[in-house]
Amino acid sequence: MRNIMYFGGTCQSPALPALVRPPAPPLQPSLDIKPFLPFPLDTAAAVNLFPNFNAMDPIQKAVINHTFGVPLPHRRKQIISCNICQLRFNSDSQAAAHYKGTKHAKKLKALEAMKNKQKSVTAKDSAKTTFTSITTNTINTSSDKTDGTAGTPAISTTTTVEIRKSSVMTTEITSKVEKSPTTATGNSSCPSTETEEEKAKRLLYCSLCKVAVNSASQLEAHNSGTKHKTMLEARNGSGTIKAFPRAGVKGKGPVNKGNTGLQNKTFHCEICDVHVNSETQLKQHISSRRHKDRAAGKPPKPKYSPYNKLQKTAHPLGVKLVFSKEPSKPLAPRILPNPLAAAAAAAAVAVSSPFSLRTAPAATLFQTSALPPALLRPAPGPIRTAHTPVLFAPY
């Protein structure tokens, strides 16, 4: 009995190893924990949560999309393009600005002109095909006539009627063809007889000044202007601007349609005393301020420059230097000491000799009398140390 109690006590004692102890109950894994707020990811269910989702503001839709993962409906970007100019735009305002611009209008006009040319070409081709079909019909009727003479007389009568009709058609066509060159020659003769003023009024363009206007009143105002009149005078040679043929250019040559009579000429403006080499230079000179002021009689404006020609000619002080032709007299022997007198005399002889190439020195500006010998004597006391004499010679 004691042993049983002992063993029972030993089983309950903590001295036994941990392997004998019963295992602890297993813990529940953390994966079994359910989320706190389970929201469905289905877009239809999320939209059902908000019945007015489609009527909401874009900001509210963006917030709901960010929180609940409801994707916004993708809008397809509308592509706006111009097929004529081959351009794409980002908005309607850009497209409207392009359609109102001059670049688009120019391309539209060019496209319409090409279409009109193609229509005229197709009309000419259709006219040619009809003319050729008529000629082939006449040839066929003539061949039928030759065949009908050998056949029955009824067939010959029908063919003669057809031939008469075809001959009438051919005569009408030939008359039209003959009239067309006469009308063309008449139209070509009209521009030859048309004067320059009538042509300018018809085209609203001055071929002399190369100026295009928008109305007849503007053309009259241009013709009454000074620039147009001076260009007319230059062409006629009656004004102050004279035209001369350019050297080295032949007078004979192909006459251009836009010839103004001023090509290959040089011009001289007598008012300004200016020579120009071309028509464009003449136009620039006529429109310059210098020519306008001279033509109006205004005096020329003085040119201010640091180096004026008048200042070069006239000296501001007006001092005149007098040069004497006689050789200068040698220095007095009293001024120079005795050792230097010989050198001064030799220098004077060299200056006065005819073989010397040096010119005579200029006379002094102010003639003064020689200093008296009393002033040239040394002082009574030794004021400073005496220096060696210095010789001043020209060379």
UniProtKB/Swiss-Prot annotation:
Keyword Transit peptide on entry: no
- Could you confirm whether the keyword Zinc appears in this record? yes
Q: Which InterPro entries match?
A: Matrin/U1-like-C_Znf_C2H2 (IPR003604), Znf385 (IPR051845), Znf_C2H2_sf (IPR036236), Znf_C2H2_type (IPR013087)
- Region annotation (Disordered) ranges: 169-194, 282-309
Pfam families per record: zf-met
Q: What UniProt keywords apply to this chain's record, in alphabetical order?
A: Metal-binding, Nucleus, Repeat, Zinc, Zinc-finger
* Gene3D superfamilies with a match to the protein in the record: Classic Zinc Finger
Q: Where are the zinc fingers (Matrin-type)?
A: 80-110, 204-234, 267-297
Where in the cell is the protein located?
A: Nucleus
Main localisation: nucleus
Report the record's disulfide bonds: none
Polar residues bias locations: 169-193
User: One Gene Ontology cellular component annotation?
Assistant: nucleus
GO MF terms here are: sequence-specific double-stranded DNA binding; zinc ion binding
List the protein's name.
Answer: Zinc finger protein 385D
Q: Which organism is it from?
A: Homo sapiens
